[in-house]
Amino acid sequence: MSESVLIVGTGPGLSTSLARLCFSKGLKVALASRNIEKLNDLKKEIKAETFICDASNVKDVSNLFKQTDKSIGTPNLVIYNASSRPKKNSVVELDPIETQKSINITCFGAFLVAQEAAKRMLKRKSGSIFFTGATAGVKGFANSSVFAMGKFGLRGLAQSLARELHPQGIHVAHFVIDGVINKESSGDYQTIHPDEIAKTYLQLHHQ
């Protein structure tokens, strides 16, 4: 019986590499994003299911999993790759409402997705829930307070869930991406190729 994967927060870079790799390994693929029009080419390429979802919205996430259950079956692997940071980073310039929205997407959305995934995976006592973190979740940098809050919270969520769910057969992992992922917006930075990162995710899922 083939496995399935749900990737939440799909865009260029790592999410696309993950989707392609999973498809090449025989997994059924579902992709979720606030803007699915940008996924049209990828959808056709790998025959993926695509769903509109604001990961910080309780109803959206609940509906996403119901739709995924019907289309590709309950996912064996769920990857939370959504994150957000405001345009302005200085603490005195940050808008509180935009700050809250960013934290909700980066951290609270991860909780909502993990909760729905765990409800399903616990029934069969297997599955993987993966979170994409960043160096900002380990070390807070100047002018990056909002991103740091979200990513620190994400790391704490992952650690707690790993201890709670591992005894029941569910694999929870948090990946710290310590560098800039190679994509069009990366500029001239030294970058990490997303295909190589994607291989690590799938290897860990199959351990």
Placement of each model-derived feature along the sequence:
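Active-site loop of short-chain dehydrogenase/reductase
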Residues: E3, T74-P75, M121-G133, P167-I170
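N-terminal Rossmann NAD(P)H-binding glycine-rich loop of SDR-like oxidoreductase domains
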Residues: G11, A19
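Catalytic loop of short-chain dehydrogenase/reductase
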Residues: G9, S102, S128-G153, Q159, ...
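A short, exposed helix-loop element centered on a Lys and neighboring polar residues
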Residues: A114-Q115, Q159
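C-terminal helical subdomain
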Residues: P167-Q207
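Conserved mid-core segment of classical short-chain dehydrogenase/reductases
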Residues: S83-I97, N143
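Rossmann-fold cofactor-recognition segment
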Residues: I46-K59
